[in-house]
């Protein structure tokens, strides 16, 4: 009989990177509900109104990008999969992007009033810089070639997020908002894998192109990065001028733009290196998460639930 639909066989791996990425992503699975965000309320109350406004806006911007990535971005990459295991990896990535987007709402519900949350989302959905970068990336997702879509995704994952990530990492380095920053570190850990994996898949396709097409795509890629960086400069100035961090954030952005290019197998564009980035922020960007005492659940790492034996009555839900 002719095969209508094929079952995925994880014992016949075509690309070992698919398997290793799947294992990495599933090993580091997490949910925002396991982070004790309310422990940051004392720190939050001590921040100035200007700082609170900044935190709300950067997380609003990050929510927008993660929403787009979970709804449009990963779906756009599926059309060019090489193996069934790659599709499984994208399923995981798409779900975790939704977890990331939801995590910011958990932060808002802990730190902000209902009115403040509404203001944050109104600002997010109307900010010209945010809407511009969403439009640039999403138009590529909708109309670009398979390789162009991968470039857009890596630029989003490894570059555009970092204007927002700077704030919680800076506070973490100053011993503030440690649990909020723990969520950001978990997100960064995921995005690091996403960017590397999608960049690897890009390189497979790029290396199959004739040299002339490679040069044309490289020119397009660097032009896109310039366009995104120019918009990101304006976004950064609008957010950070009030607290005096603008130039430090721009340095951080340029450093991560180079990392995005490296994920794509390309040469760096900017002269900035890790040595140029604020060391407090670089220390926070480590993709390890904080330690915690499992038995007493002390600390700001990922908390596991207490284990209890099941009893007969536990199976009676909905039957009373």
Model-derived regions: residue spans:
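Non-heme di-metal
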Residues: 1-320
């Amino acid at each position: 009989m002719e095969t209508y639909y094929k079952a995925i066989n994880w014992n016949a791996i075509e690309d070992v990177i698919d398997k290793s990425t799947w294992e990495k992503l599933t090993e580091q699975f997490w949910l925002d509900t396991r982070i004790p965000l309310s422990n940051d309320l004392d720190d939050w109350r001590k921040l100035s109104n200007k700082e609170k406004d900044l935190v709300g806006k950067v997380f609003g911007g990050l929510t927008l990008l993660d929403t787009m990535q979970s709804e449009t971005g990963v779906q756009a990459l599926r059309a060019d999969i090489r193996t069934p295991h790659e599709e499984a990896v994208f399923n995981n990535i798409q779900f975790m992007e939704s977890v990331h987007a939801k995590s910011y709402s958990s932060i808002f519900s802990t730190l902000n009033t209902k009115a403040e949350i509404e203001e944050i989302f109104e600002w997010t959905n109307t900010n010209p810089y945010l809407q511009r970068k969403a439009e640039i990336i999403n138009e590529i997702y909708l109309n670009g070639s398979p390789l162009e879509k991968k470039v857009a995704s890596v630029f989003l994952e490894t570059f555009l997020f970092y204007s927002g990530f700077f704030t919680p990492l800076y506070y973490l380095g100053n011993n503030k908002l440690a649990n909020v920053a723990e969520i950001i570190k978990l997100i960064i850990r995921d995005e690091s894998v996403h960017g590397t994996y999608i960049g690897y898949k890009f390189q497979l396709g790029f290396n199959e192109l004739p040299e002339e097409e490679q040069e044309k795509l490289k020119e397009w890629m660097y032009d896109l990065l310039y366009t995104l960086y120019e918009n990101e400069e304006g976004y950064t100035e609008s957010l950070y001028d009030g607290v005096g961090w603008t130039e430090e954030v721009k340095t951080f952005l340029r450093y991560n733009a180079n990392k995005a290019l490296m994920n794509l197998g390309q040469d760096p564009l900017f002269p900035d290196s890790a040595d140029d980035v604020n060391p407090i922020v670089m220390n926070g960007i480590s993709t390890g998460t904080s330690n915690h005492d499992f038995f007493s659940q002390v600390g700001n790492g990922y908390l596991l639930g207490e284990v209890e034996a099941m009893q007969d009555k536990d199976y009676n839900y909905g039957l009373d």
